[in-house]
Amino acid sequence: MSVTPSIDAVRDLRAASCGPVGAPSVTSELSENIILTSLDDLHNWARLSSLWPLLYGTACCFIEFAALIGSRFDFDRFGLVPRSSPRQADLLIVAGTVTMKMAPALVRLYEQMPEPKYVIAMGACTITGGMFSADSTTAVRGVDKLIPVDLYLPGCPPRPEAIFDAVIKLRKKVGDESVSERIKIAQTHRYFTVPHQMKRVEPIVTGAYLSADTQKAALSPGAGLPMAAELNTSEIDASPASQPSSTYES
């Protein structure tokens, strides 16, 4: 048996449904289906999940990074997609020794990368010059003298697990950035390439020491000693083997 509502109940229902819309209340069901965030968090989340590295390997450290491409470590889960062009990359991984001759090429690759961009210095040779920092005259003592570095990864060479740890720390840095702060920093902390004005230097070792008086005095006691037959140039020049032959044997 149905109950017919009264006229007053119908009027109250019409007034409640046709009145002005009030502020909606966020229920527990709505908060579970909608994520409230900011523009910075959304932008950083998209960037940290799609880091595209440009691999700049010059020595043995790059072999350890090449192991990440295999299925054992599977670095694709971090969104890392290796790129061969600097214009498509936002992460530069420098692995190995950087020499004076390779320094301009490295700086050019960094300048061709779009903003925002990050750099990971991988290995002791990249960070400080490594075992080449003591005696080598061409090794760069630290890649941070050429380009700004965001994260240092020590080791000789670092293991693939250490590279994962470096990527995770870089993702945390990317997630804490702000668009407005990054614009201000870009205006006050700009990176300019320093042109190297190189000039020619005369060689130090020219062979002039052989004609010095001290060298002549050291060689004078052996001036009167007999010379071995094998070192006698006059006999070598007169030998038949040293003369060119005009006939050919078939």
Swiss-Prot record:
Domain of life according to the entry: Bacteria
Gene3D superfamilies noted in UniProt: 3.40.50.12280
UniProt keyword terms in alphabetical order: 4Fe-4S, Iron, Iron-sulfur, Membrane, Metal-binding, NAD, NADP, Plastoquinone, Quinone, Thylakoid, Translocase, Transport
Keyword Membrane among UniProt keywords: yes
Name recorded for this polypeptide: NAD(P)H-quinone oxidoreductase subunit K
SUPFAM superfamilies on file: HydA/Nqo6-like
Entry cofactors: [4Fe-4S] cluster
Membrane disposition: Peripheral membrane protein
Record note on cofactor: Binds 1 [4Fe-4S] cluster.
Role noted for this protein: NDH-1 shuttles electrons from an unknown electron donor, via FMN and iron-sulfur (Fe-S) centers, to quinones in the respiratory and/or the photosynthetic chain. The immediate electron acceptor for the enzyme in this species is believed to be plastoquinone. Couples the redox reaction to proton translocation, and thus conserves the redox energy in a proton gradient. Cyanobacterial NDH-1 also plays a role in inorganic carbon-concentration.
Organism this protein belongs to: Prochlorococcus marinus (strain MIT 9303)
Reactions it catalyzes: a plastoquinone + NADH + (n+1) H(+)(in) = a plastoquinol + NAD(+) + n H(+)(out); a plastoquinone + NADPH + (n+1) H(+)(in) = a plastoquinol + NADP(+) + n H(+)(out)
UniProt-annotated stretches for the region Disordered: 230-250
Gene (name only): ndhK
InterPro entries: NADH_UbQ_OxRdtase-like_20kDa, NADH_UQ_OxRdtase_20Kd_su
